[in-house]
Amino acid sequence: MNKVYLANAFSINMLTKFPTKVVIDKIDRLEFCENIDNEDIINSIGHDSTIQLINSLCGTTFQKNRVEIKLEKEDKLYVVQISQRLEEGKILTLEEILKLYESGKVQFFEIIVD
């Protein structure tokens, strides 16, 4: 059975087999929220403000859950990502991450291992 994950980043270290193909699509908030509202999704986000942002935007009830992701063929990964580099060690508050979202600096992606 294919797995579906939620994360705040994508890394090559998540891939288990090489060579491999990965399809990355930028999606809007609505599509992101529809796809993560799934009881089988494996949440791997370990940042309070990111979880609060997702719950606020999508009406979900995720909790922090810092787990390792290992993607297999046909697995999906939904990513919420800040599109600007933060100061080293910066931990965002909910207000700060909401401000980034409102200014278009938070993006959503669907990643599929092909």
UniProtKB/Swiss-Prot annotation:
Pfam families named in the record: STIV_B116-like
UniProt source species: Sulfolobus islandicus rod-shaped virus 1
Protein name: Uncharacterized protein 114
InterPro entries: STIV_B116-like, STIV_B116-like_sf
